[in-house]
């Protein structure tokens, strides 16, 4: 984990544990950089992450403030540029993964097109139920090219795929393209997510790509409506 990520995690915990008063600016970058024994640039990058997450906002000439509505609740909050994966997004929660299906297959025309591969290139097909603090949160269906993301196995699937990609394979995840839509729950959602027949589902269609610009993941995540929030923060300068 990079220094700025360690600092961002600590600052995130401080914000959510009310270490800093919400009606006053947090300590300035110079003071925080000195406290964390880091450069000001590293400190700025850490705070930039928290601004992007919707926890902080900067007011020119006045400092950096906590956004009061960003206090922790029981939902998964995803901001527009979030590419961490659920395990990293909810570090302070107990997360389990139940692997429902895992196999290598040849992609359909649609899957191949989203991954920029041909239909003769094998992909992992993974269906996982993500359980947070004992409650089912999201049902994930994921496709990844086997040649691009080698080494996926049961151990990885029960831990974090993104940690495997970044820490083991040393690949850099550069970005993501998402489409978010409301859907009716189907019998599979009802079976695994514990939702009712009339409950809506928030589906996220996702294409992730590496810093080379190559897509490495095409997935669909089916979220319980009561456990998922998309956060967009716009600050008037």
Curated annotation (Swiss-Prot):
Chain ranges passing through the membrane: none
UniProt cross-references to InterPro entries, sorted A to Z: Bact_HTH_transcr_reg (IPR050679), Chorismate_lyase_/UTRA_dom_sf (IPR028978), Tscrpt_reg_HTH_GntR (IPR000524), UTRA (IPR011663), WH-like_DNA-bd_sf (IPR036388), WH_DNA-bd_sf (IPR036390)
Stimuli inducing this protein: Up-regulated by konjac glucomannan and by cellobiose and mannobiose, the possible degradation products of glucomannan. Repressed by glucose via the carbon catabolite repression system.
Main location: cytoplasm
GO MF terms, alphabetically ordered: DNA binding; DNA-binding transcription factor activity
rRNA-binding among keywords: no
Disulfide bond sites: none
Pfam families: GntR, UTRA
Annotated Gene Ontology cellular component terms: cytoplasm
HTH gntR-type domain segment(s): 1-69
Cellular localization per UniProt: Cytoplasm
Domain of life: Bacteria
Location of the DNA-binding region in this protein: 29-48
Keywords assigned: Cytoplasm, DNA-binding, Repressor, Transcription, Transcription regulation
Function: Transcriptional repressor of the gmuBACDREFG operon which is involved in the uptake and degradation of glucomannan.
Protein name in the entry: HTH-type transcriptional regulator GmuR
Provenance organism: Bacillus subtilis (strain 168)
Gene responsible for this protein: gmuR
